[in-house]
C-alpha cells in the first residue's frame, strides 16, 4: 500500500534502542510489514544546522555572560532554535550583539566539526561540557567545533546530528530573549 509515516522525533531508550515518534500521513501498517525509509534531506540538514548553532550559542553565552551559564533546556526544529539557560538578568543589546558576533565568526571560518568517542573522564579532561546530573555510559560522544588558534571554540558531550563544517550553519540571528522562570532566560534564534 502507499503507507506514509512522518517521523517527528527520535529518542534513544534502553541502551541502543531508538524509538521513532510521529504520525501516519497515509495508509496503514500491520505488525511485520516491511517499510522503506526515506530521509527528508532538507529537514535533516536544517535540523543539523540549528542543532550545531545551539552549541555555538551556548559557548558564546558563557563567554559573554560568564561561566555560570548552563543549559536548562532547548528545542531544535528545522526552522528555528530555542535555548533556555541560567542567567539572573535580561541580556543587554550590546551583549546580544557580542553573542551573535561570536557565533557568526565561527560560522564564517567554516571550521570542521569533529566528533570523538572517549570515556566521560577523558571528555572532562578535554574540556567538554556535560549536563550536570546526567548519567553517562562507559563511552561518550564528544562534539568539538570552531578552530581558534589550534583550540576548539566549543566542546560538549552530544549524541545528536550535526553539520560537517560550521559554514553549513549560515548567518545566525537572535530574534528574542525572555525570562521563563526565576534565574532562567530563553533565547530564540533563526539562521539564513
Feature map (PLM): residue ranges:
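A glycine- and charged-residue-rich anion-binding loop/surface
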Residues: 1-192
Amino acid at each position: 500500500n502507499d503507507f506514509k509515516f512522518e517521523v517527528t522525533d527520535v529518542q534513544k531508550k534502553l541502551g541502543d534502542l531508538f524509538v521513532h515518534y510521529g504520525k501516519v500521513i497515509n495508509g496503514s501498517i500491520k505488525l511485520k510489514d516491511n517499510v522503506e525509509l526515506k530521509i527528508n534531506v532538507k529537514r535533516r540538514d536544517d535540523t543539523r544546522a540549528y542543532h550545531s548553532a545551539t552549541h555555538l550559542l551556548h559557548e558564546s553565552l558563557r563567554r559573554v555572560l560568564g561561566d555560570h551559564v548552563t543549559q536548562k533546556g532547548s528545542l531544535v526544529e528545522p526552522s528555528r532554535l530555542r535555548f533556555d539557560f541560567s542567567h539572573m538578568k535580561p541580556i543587554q543589546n550590546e551583549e546580544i550583539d557580542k553573542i551573535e558576533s561570536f557565533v557568526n565568526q565561527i560560522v564564517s571560518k567554516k571550521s570542521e566539526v569533529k566528533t570523538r568517542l572517549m570515556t566521560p573522564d577523558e571528555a572532562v579532561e578535554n574540556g567538554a561540557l556535560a549536563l550536570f546530573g546526567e548519567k553517562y555510559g562507559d563511552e561518550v560522544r564528544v562534539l568539538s567545533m570552531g578552530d581558534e588558534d589550534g583550540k576548539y571554540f566549543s566542546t560538549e558531550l552530544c549524541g545528536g546530528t550535526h553539520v560537517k563544517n560550521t559554514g553549513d550553519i549560515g548567518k545566525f540571528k537572535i530574534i528574542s530573549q525572555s525570562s521563563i522562570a526565576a534565574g532562567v532566560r530563553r533565547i530564540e534564534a533563526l539562521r539564513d
